[in-house]
Amino acid sequence: QYGKDYPAILPAAAYKVTRQTGAGRGVYSFCMCPGGWVVNASSEEGHLAVNGMSYQARDSRNANSAMIVTVTPDDFPGTDVLAGVEFQRKLEKAAYGLCDGKVPVQLFGDFCRNVPSTMLGEVEPCIKGQYELSNVRTIFPQELSSALEEGIKGCEALIHGFSRADAVLSGVESRTSSPVRIIRNTEFESELSGLYPCGEGAGYAGGITSAAMDGLKIAEAIAKKYVPCYD
């Protein structure tokens, strides 16, 4: 992003990219980590989910971000209220099974050809936890993997080298937003008085900033109810 002339005085570069596929799906970067790490963030036995993080110095070899493909209820069968959760768990189970719990890694060029990676290129993964070269594409339904490929290739027009053949894909980041939303009333309470659904897990945010803003609203609602002098 900044070039190579002044590395001593410039911070690690951040980016944000978004594209729309020919089929109408959105593909966009999420939780971009300059000079960051991919971490194994699994929370359920037999399932695997990854996330991204940066230390304060932001000085690892790589930048990383989740590349998100939008989904709709048409992508998962059934009308149960938790059908989206089951779809998420299905992806995480497939990711776990691919490399027996290690983070599956694939070069983007191999992803496009739908073949397992057998060696790395110039880009070396920065991953906390064990990883293994594999075929990340097999985790996803065809519609999602095709959209991801098209979206990443489209981002080349925004950042030169974004879709280079040896760019590293890791999977799967499936916790970007909640697949369910806990209903709350005009006072921000759930059906159970005094219980305030809030933030990403409750379905009211999609990132750190929006979760913080939702938290402020909830704090104000609680103060207004329980501290009469708040107004």
Regions found by a protein language model. Give the residues of each.
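Residues forming the flavin
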Residues: 1-231
